[in-house]
Each structure stands twice: as structure tokens, then as C-alpha cells.
């Protein structure tokens, strides 16, 4: 193997950067993928820069020659301690191919002490189903995937290019290309959930086992002249964030992750919004989810909340109290019926045209759970 491919470079030349990082959505004649990286070590609330560099990968060769795999080989070869938490940022000329995504998902699963952010100049074969699904899988594995904006191009120019003191100059249609790629990526990642993930975790049989993860599909609507208007850019999918005790992180439930997301939605206090959650488990009490949601609704009176739950936590009086707390805060809490399951399948699942197939007992379980929830909210539950 060419050692230049396996070992990182410090920087690239100006022409190389302009030629390979141009954000034209469809670009031919580029036989290399370029990857600029930063690795930081998390220390409390700050991050210490550990290393930076550039990898060049060959596009049309076997996956082990791709830039992403060169980085993983180099990173793992350093035998870094598992008790330290690392924050990796990539600036890449193309998003990873499906083979590289599979390896990246495996790497992230085996290294809970690592977070990965990938900012790409272009989307690789974004019109092909397998490549779109690979991006969904990458995001579902925990990687943050974005499109490079002007600030990130300028940052790469300053830190990874022999720029000879010159400033970064964007090319023709730079903003137009970015807008298209950003919109396309958001559309791809909207359909984040794998079909098997949905059917496994949203099964509403109260006796199902091994469903400890909470999945939350959300959408936001704005009230316009008495009509709720869906905001397509504010739809998505979240799940619990895994704990990492080595880094002192105890995890975060999907409901709290949504509340963390709200500031980025930039909801105008002068407007009225309705947030809808389709959630595999009703919000819990022990992690403070119900209390945090109540506080959010009290502080944001311009936001309405509807919660459709596949199953409810009601085995403990405190969990029943959590449901009552949400009701008292103004949230509308209901059990998912066939209509909600089908809507989630059509809206939030990468279903490839397949219609929703209900599982045995769906309607019976929904009716029974609705009765239990109604008793709790009417203070009739034990």
C-alpha cells in the first residue's frame, strides 16, 4: 500500500483544495477523496486539541484504500486509552460510501468514548437508494452529518491548506450549491429509522421484552389563520443517548434530547406552535423527563405538545404521577392507534414504498392501553 495514503499529511495545496472540495452537487473526474481531521480530547467542559492532519483516499479502489478507512487504521493504531473521551471532526470532499459507513458504524459501536462529526463538501451518489440509506445508518450510529458551509470552507482553508496568506474565495454558485446539498441531506435524514428498528421498538404489546430504548419521532406545526401548517424542516427522529461512565456521562433520554434541540428550531415567541411526539414509551419519572417537559411547557406558553405513546410506563405509582404531571402541564397524552402507527411508518421510516403491516394484536393492545391511560388520567388507576 502507498504509505502516503496510510499516513496523514499536514496540509494540501491550494489547487488541490479548490479542485476537490468544490461543492458542485454532481462533479466528475475526481479520483481521490480528501479528509481533513481534528481529534480533540474532552476534559470537563473544554476540549484539548490532540492532532490534526489530512488523508487522501482512492475512490475507485477497495474500501481499505478510502480516506475514511485510512483514518480509522491510523487512529486505532495509536492505541489510545479507552478511559479518555475523543471528539473527532472530519471535513471531507465526499460523504462516505456504504462500505465505509458499515465500518464506521461498527467503530462507533465499539468505541463509546468517541464522537464523530462529518462535514462534507458533497453528497456521494445521493440519488442512489443504497447511498441514501447509508447516510441514514451513519446518523443512526451516532455520527453527526452536515454539509460544509462558508465558515467551514474558510476554516479548512486556514488550517489544512498551504494558502500562502491568501483568503478563501468561494466559487460561482457556492451559496446555491450549499442550499441544494443542505436541503437534500435534511430530506435524506428525515427518513432515519430502519423498518426493523421501527417494528421492533414501536410494537405496542405491553409484554414485549428487551425494549429499553426510547424512540421519539417528532414534528412541529405553526398556527396560520386557524390552520396548523407542518414545518418540513422541523421533523425528525431521536433516541436515547447511551451512557458513557468512563467520561462521566450518564446518558440522556430522547425527550430531553428534543428539549436540547428546541433552541436550534428558533421558534418565534409571537407565533403559536404545536409539537407532536410519537414515542415508543411514555415519558418516565425517575430520569426527570416528565418534570423537564412540564417546566418547558410552563416557560414556553406559545408551544402546545401532543404525545402519542406506543406503550406507557405505569407499573409504579411515580410513573402514573408522571403522566398526570404532563396532563396538568397542558400536554395532550394519548395512545397510538393504527392511524398513528401508519402515519409514523409513512413519514419517519425508510420504507422504500412498502406499506405499513400491522402486527398481531395491534388494535387490541391499543384499546387496552387506552383504557389504562384513561384510568390514570382520571385518577382511577391504582
Curated annotation (Swiss-Prot):
Q: What is catalyzed by this enzyme?
A: a 2'-deoxycytidine in single-stranded DNA + H2O + H(+) = a 2'-deoxyuridine in single-stranded DNA + NH4(+)
Q: Write out the catalytic residues in the record.
A: 255
CDD domains given in the database record: cytidine_deaminase (cd01283)
Q: Which domain of life is it from?
A: Eukaryota
Q: Where in the cell is it found?
A: Nucleus
The free-text tissue note of the record is:
Expressed at high and moderate levels in peripheral blood leukocytes, spleen, testes, heart, thymus, prostate and ovary. Also expressed at low levels in several other tissues.
Which top EC class applies here? hydrolase
Cofactor(s) recorded in Swiss-Prot or TrEMBL: Zn(2+)
Kindly list the positions annotated as binding Zn(2+).
66, 97, 100, 253, 284, 289
Q: Which family does it belong to?
A: Belongs to the cytidine and deoxycytidylate deaminase family.
Which Gene Ontology MF annotations are present? cytidine deaminase activity; RNA binding; zinc ion binding
Another remark in the UniProt entry says:
It is one of seven related genes or pseudogenes found in a cluster, thought to result from gene duplication, on chromosome 22.
Which keywords does this chain's UniProt record carry? Antiviral defense, Hydrolase, Immunity, Innate immunity, Metal-binding, Nucleus, Repeat, RNA-binding, Zinc
Stated induction or repression of this protein's expression: Phorbol 12-myristate 13-acetate (PMA) induces overexpression in keratinocytes. Up-regulated by IFN-alpha.
Protein name as catalogued: DNA dC->dU-editing enzyme APOBEC-3B
- In this entry, which stretches build a coiled coil? none
Pinpoint the CMP/dCMP-type deaminase domain residues: 29-138, 210-326
User: Gene3D superfamilies this protein is in?
Assistant: Cytidine Deaminase, domain 2
Tell me the organism: Homo sapiens
Stated role: DNA deaminase (cytidine deaminase) which acts as an inhibitor of retrovirus replication and retrotransposon mobility via deaminase-dependent and -independent mechanisms. After the penetration of retroviral nucleocapsids into target cells of infection and the initiation of reverse transcription, it can induce the conversion of cytosine to uracil in the minus-sense single-strand viral DNA, leading to G-to-A hypermutations in the subsequent plus-strand viral DNA.
What is written about domains in the entry's comments? The CMP/dCMP deaminase domain 1 mediates RNA binding, RNA-dependent oligomerization and virion incorporation whereas the CMP/dCMP deaminase domain 2 confers deoxycytidine deaminase activity and substrate sequence specificity.
Q: Name one Pfam family in it.
A: NAD2
Amino acid at each position: 500500500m502507498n504509505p502516503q495514503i496510510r499516513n496523514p499529511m499536514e496540509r494540501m495545496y491550494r489547487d488541490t483544495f479548490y479542485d476537490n472540495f468544490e461543492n458542485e452537487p454532481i462533479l466528475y473526474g475526481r479520483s481521490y477523496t480528501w479528509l481533513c481531521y481534528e481529534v480533540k480530547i474532552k476534559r470537563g467542559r473544554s476540549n484539548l486539541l490532540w492532532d490534526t492532519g489530512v488523508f487522501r483516499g482512492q475512490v475507485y479502489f477497495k474500501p481499505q484504500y478510502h480516506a475514511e478507512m485510512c483514518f480509522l487504521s491510523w487512529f486505532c493504531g495509536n492505541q489510545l486509552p479507552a478511559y479518555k473521551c475523543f471528539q473527532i471532526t472530519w471535513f471531507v470532499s465526499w460523504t462516505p460510501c456504504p462500505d465505509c459507513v458499515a465500518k464506521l458504524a461498527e467503530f462507533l459501536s465499539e468505541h463509546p468514548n468517541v464522537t464523530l462529526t462529518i462535514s462534507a463538501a458533497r453528497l456521494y451518489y445521493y440519488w442512489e437508494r443504497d447511498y441514501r440509506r447509508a447516510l441514514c445508518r451513519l446518523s443512526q450510529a451516532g455520527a453527526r452529518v452536515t454539509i460544509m458551509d462558508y465558515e467551514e470552507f474558510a476554516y479548512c482553508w486556514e488550517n489544512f491548506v498551504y494558502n500562502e496568506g491568501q483568503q478563501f474565495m468561494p466559487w460561482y454558485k457556492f451559496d446555491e450549491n450549499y442550499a441544494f446539498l443542505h436541503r437534500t441531506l435534511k430530506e435524506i435524514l428525515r427518513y432515519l429509522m430502519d423498518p426493523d428498528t421501527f417494528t421492533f421498538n414501536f410494537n405496542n404489546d405491553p409484554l414485549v421484552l428487551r425494549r429499553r430504548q426510547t424512540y421519539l419521532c417528532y414534528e412541529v406545526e405553526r398556527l396560520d389563520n386557524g390552520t396548523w401548517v407542518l414545518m418540513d424542516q422541523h421533523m425528525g427522529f431521536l433516541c436515547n443517548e447511551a451512557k458513557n461512565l468512563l467520561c462521566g456521562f450518564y446518558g440522556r433520554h430522547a425527550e430531553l434530547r428534543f428539549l436540547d434541540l428546541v433552541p436550534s428550531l428558533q421558534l418565534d415567541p409571537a407565533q403559536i406552535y404545536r409539537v407532536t411526539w410519537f414515542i415508543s414509551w411514555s415519558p418516565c419519572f425517575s430520569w426527570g423527563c416528565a418534570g423537564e417537559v412540564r417546566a418547558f411547557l410552563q416557560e414556553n406558553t406559545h408551544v402546545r405538545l401532543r404525545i402519542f405513546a406506543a406503550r406507557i410506563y405505569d407499573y409504579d405509582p411515580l410513573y402514573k404521577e408522571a403522566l398526570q404531571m404532563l396532563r396538568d402541564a397542558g400536554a395532550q397524552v394519548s395512545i397510538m392507534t393504527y392511524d398513528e402507527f401508519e402515519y409514523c411508518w409513512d413519514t419517519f421510516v425508510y420504507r422504500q414504498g412498502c406499506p405499513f403491516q400491522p402486527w398481531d394484536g395491534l388494535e387490541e393492545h391499543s384499546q387496552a392501553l387506552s383504557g389504562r391511560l384513561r384510568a390514570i388520567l382520571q385518577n382511577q388507576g391504582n
